[in-house]
Structures are given as structure tokens and as C-alpha cells.
A protein has these predicted regions:
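Short glycine/proline-enriched turns and hinge-like loops at secondary-structure junctions
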Residues: 27-30
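Short beta-strand->loop micro-motif that forms the acidic, two-metal-ion catalytic signature
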Residues: 33-36
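Catalytic core of pol beta-like nucleotidyltransferases
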Residues: 1-14, 22-24, 39-129
């Protein structure tokens, strides 16, 4: 089955690779992070079937549904994504802009969480001495 047929069967309009393989930094045993977006809601069974179908093209697929991804994960996907399939031209570029915007909207909250965690770790270190 071709990537296009997989996309048609599951109403996928976007398939991208991200993570270490997309960055060219994979090591032996690295999985292949694949993010997909469907025009319909994907069930867990759909996700497992998509991952199994894509295993014919990529080793050890770890599948992510873009519609269910957190802003932090969207930022990671958008940062180093490599296009595998897009139903129409420019959809990939539109996704990268969307992912960046979602991440940047979340970033102030993420920064506050990091600062709070750092303060808690610093306080713990001081108590340990």
C-alpha cells in the first residue's frame, strides 16, 4: 500500500516525520516519530492501523495525532518536521505556522512552570545541605 492510499483510507491530509530521524540524529534503535492529521476523528484502533501501515516505509513508527497534540508537542513537531504527504500544496507550511503559534501562546505558561520547578529544586538543594 502506498502512502497516498494510507492517507486516503484514513482521511489524512498531512503526514510528517519529526524527532531524531527528521533531524538526521537517529541512533541504532531509534523509533520513527510520525505525526498525522485527519479530517475525521481517529480512534485508537485507527492510529494503530496507520502506524502498522507506515511501518512498511519507516522503522518502528511512533504515531502522533496532530489534533490531539499538546502545544509543547506541536512546537517540537513543527520545529523539525519533514513532509511525507500533504493533500494540497501549502498545507505543510500552514501547519508549521499553526504549530509555532500554538507553542508561542503556551510559552509564557511553560516559562512560569520552569521557574517554579527551578525554585523548588533550589529550595530542596538548600534543605539538603
Amino acid at each position: 500500500m502506498s502512502v497516498e492510499k494510507i492517507a486516503d483510507e484514513f482521511s489524512l491530509d498531512l503526514i510528517v516525520m519529526f524527532g531524531s530521524r527528521a533531524r538526521g540524529q537517529s541512533i541504532r534503535g531509534s523509533d520513527t516519530d510520525i505525526a498525522v492529521r485527519s479530517t475525521r476523528t481517529l480512534s485508537r484502533d485507527d492510529e494503530l492501523r496507520i502506524a502498522a501501515a507506515l511501518d512498511a516505509f519507516f522503522p518502528d513508527v511512533d504515531l502522533c495525532d496532530i489534533r490531539k497534540a499538546s502545544p509543547l508537542l506541536l512546537g517540537a513537531i513543527g520545529q523539525d518536521a519533514k513532509l511525507i504527504y500533504e493533500r494540497r500544496e501549502s498545507l505543510f507550511e500552514e501547519f508549521k505556522i499553526f504549530a509555532w503559534n500554538q507553542y508561542m501562546d503556551f510559552k509564557p505558561q511553560l516559562d512560569r512552570i520552569r521557574e517554579r520547578n527551578k525554585a523548588e529544586i533550589d529550595a530542596f538543594d538548600e534543605d539538603s545541605e
